[in-house]
Amino acid sequence: MSNVRYISNLTRETYALILAGGRGSRLHELTDWRAKPALYFGGKFRIIDFPLSNCINSGIRRVGVVTQYKSHSLIRHVMRGWGHFKKELGESVEILPASQRYSENWYQGTADAVFQNIDIIRHELPKYVMVLSGDHVYRMDYAGLLAAHAESGADMTVSCLEVPVAEAAGAFGVMEVDDEMRILGFEEKPKHPKHSPGNPEKCLASMGNYVFNTEFLFDQLKKDAQNANSDRDFGKDIIPSIIEKHKVFAYPFKSAFPNEQAYWRDVGTLDSFWQANMELLSPTPALNLYDAKWPIWTYQEQLPPAKFVFDDDDRRGMAVDSIISGGCIISGATVRRSVLFNEVRVCSYSVVEDSVVLPDVVVLRHCKIKNAIIDRGCIIPEGTVIGYNHDHDRAKGFRVSEKGITLVTRDMLGLPVGYE
């Protein structure tokens, strides 16, 4: 059997579950009215588009999206952008909201979110179940992970990557492996992670992406559901309980293409979210959104093109080293090193620098904004200065991050909130 046909058979026998129910509390007010996977990224996408695109580009066409926290905008986006698959051809992207299928509780943890959908998974008759994190931005060919799982004879395979020890502390599951990448130890979000052999600065962290043999997964979830002391979590409970008696392997994260550096970003804090967007402005960014070999799919709104108007000596509509999305109007204003999402308007004599501006924002005249994240629908009053003096920003009710990024939301401006 050719390698292409072998991979094709593996992906056809796989059902993917994307866990997209988390809030992302370290993003503070940015996720007050949306789940983290519904957060905007890269000018026109949402975070959920990246694991979904990875599935489609990898050949996995049966996908369930598990939702819970403030899921309206997430569900709406997935239905609009990903609802075109044909069930009669064995393709589907389905929404799986918390629905108290087996108890009166909502999803209690990552393992419980899968357990409560066992009947739906079983109906699909997959040989393998892939459980994926829905709140990271990355490019990954899941077919390689599937092939490694099948060839090793593993019961479970955990996708992993090396991260700095300081970054992993309290944030990631950390594992120990032998020379064959079999997992010998696993600790969920330790305060003092064990470093990789021979590298005291790095440790092997779980990406939250797993492959299971289906019946093995069901057996472990049922056992876990009967354990009154369990947190119903893969990292805290399932993995530590099975590594001694079962074959659990680690799979090092690789680029989808040879000779390219693998790309993965957590974007779980205001600083990391801002930084990951800023990286896209490089002439040769680590994440190339223009790569036709691995397209990122999303819901395409029908919008007019961006427009730049006025070319006077005292006001000139211009943008430099920036991403400007559909429907934007830069009217006699200057935008430098910034990411502007759909239908942003920047009015005359204003300057926006080193900032991430989410959709439907209006920046009125004579504003100065730098090192900021402006949430969707904000109307920045005329003459407002943001990002130049952190004490002044805090006095206005804005949030300033550890690294000096200013977050502005509608609520902070006294505008109506509650719908995303």
UniProtKB/Swiss-Prot annotation:
Q: Which family does it belong to?
A: Belongs to the bacterial/plant glucose-1-phosphate adenylyltransferase family.
Highest taxon listed in the record's lineage: Bacteria
**Does Transmembrane helix appear among the keywords?**
no
Q: Function, please?
A: Involved in the biosynthesis of ADP-glucose, a building block required for the elongation reactions to produce glycogen. Catalyzes the reaction between ATP and alpha-D-glucose 1-phosphate (G1P) to produce pyrophosphate and ADP-Glc.
Q: What are the binding positions for alpha-D-glucose 1-phosphate in this chain?
A: Y107, G173, E188, K189, S206
Reaction equation(s) it catalyzes: alpha-D-glucose 1-phosphate + ATP + H(+) = ADP-alpha-D-glucose + diphosphate
Specify one Pfam family. NTP_transferase
Q: Which UniProt keywords apply?
A: ATP-binding, Carbohydrate metabolism, Glycogen biosynthesis, Glycogen metabolism, Nucleotide-binding, Nucleotidyltransferase, Transferase
> In the UniProt record, what gene is named as encoding this protein?
glgC
Protein name from the UniProt record: Glucose-1-phosphate adenylyltransferase
Biological pathway: Glycan biosynthesis; glycogen biosynthesis
Q: Which GO terms describe its molecular function?
A: ATP binding; glucose-1-phosphate adenylyltransferase activity
Q: How does it assemble?
A: Homotetramer.
Q: Name one GO biological process term.
A: glycogen biosynthetic process
- Enzyme Commission number(s): 2.7.7.27
